[in-house]
């Protein structure tokens, strides 16, 4: 797992404070991205997902909109929904804080970076098939399992995931292109 270590990726234990965890974190994404192609309007998807969560659990929901798709006031339509605005990281062009709290029970993210980041930080994630967290996540279409999510071994997945990211130095040396051409 030297690749993951090189990138500073370290798995946190699965939900270490499970007796205190309570929040469902629902993450939006940029609805103009290719990852969202063929999906319903983002507002409808978020609304439908909140309704699906409410059918299976009374846990409070933390709504994290994507910075480029804020969906204003959506959280006011539902009980026990807290909007958490994106926090831009200083000194970056376009990076936002992707932290998770010890009180987070599970994360729902169709295919944004929040899915893999949740898995790395020990939070079960419910994701779509196009998510990089799919292999170790829970199926987003099975939210009825949100009270008992799977939490599989993640070591091999982390190693594989680490090969989807490259440092600036590696990019300048042409390593990603060299690696990709071996797959052709």
Name each region found by the language model.
Residues 11-13, 47-48, 93-95:
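A generic local structural motif
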Residues 36, 97, 119-121, 135-143:
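Short, charged, surface-exposed secondary-structure boundary motifs
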Residues 93, 111-115, 125-137:
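Short glycine/proline-centered loop/turn elements that form peptide/ligand docking sites
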Residues 1-21, 135-184:
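Leloir-type glycosyltransferase catalytic cores
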Residues 4-10, 114-116, 121-128:
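A structural signal for the main folded, soluble domain(s) of proteins
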Residues 51-54, 59, 67-121:
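Donor nucleotide-activated moiety binding/catalytic core segment of transferases
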Residues 19-75:
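Conserved catalytic-core segment of nucleotide-activated headgroup transferases in glycan assembly
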């Amino acid at each position: 797992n030297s690749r993951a270590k090189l990138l500073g990726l370290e798995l946190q234990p699965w939900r270490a404070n499970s007796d205190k965890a309570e929040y469902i974190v629902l993450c939006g994404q940029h609805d103009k991205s290719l990852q969202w192609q063929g999906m319903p309007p983002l507002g409808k998807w978020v609304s439908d997902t909140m309704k699906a969560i409410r059918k299976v659990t009374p846990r409070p929901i933390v709504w994290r909109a994507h910075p480029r798709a804020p969906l204003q006031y959506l959280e006011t339509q539902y009980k026990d929904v807290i909007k958490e605005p994106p926090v831009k990281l200083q000194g970056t062009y376009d990076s936002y804080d992707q932290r998770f709290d010890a009180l987070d029970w599970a994360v729902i993210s169709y295919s944004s970076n929040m899915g893999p980041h949740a898995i790395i930080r020990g939070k079960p994630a419910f994701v779509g098939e196009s998510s990089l967290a799919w292999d170790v996540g829970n199926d987003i279409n099975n939210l009825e399992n949100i009270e008992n999510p799977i939490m599989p071994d993640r070591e091999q997945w982390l190693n594989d995931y680490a090969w989807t990211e490259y440092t600036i130095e590696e990019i300048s040396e042409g390593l990603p292109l060299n690696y990709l051409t071996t797959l052709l």
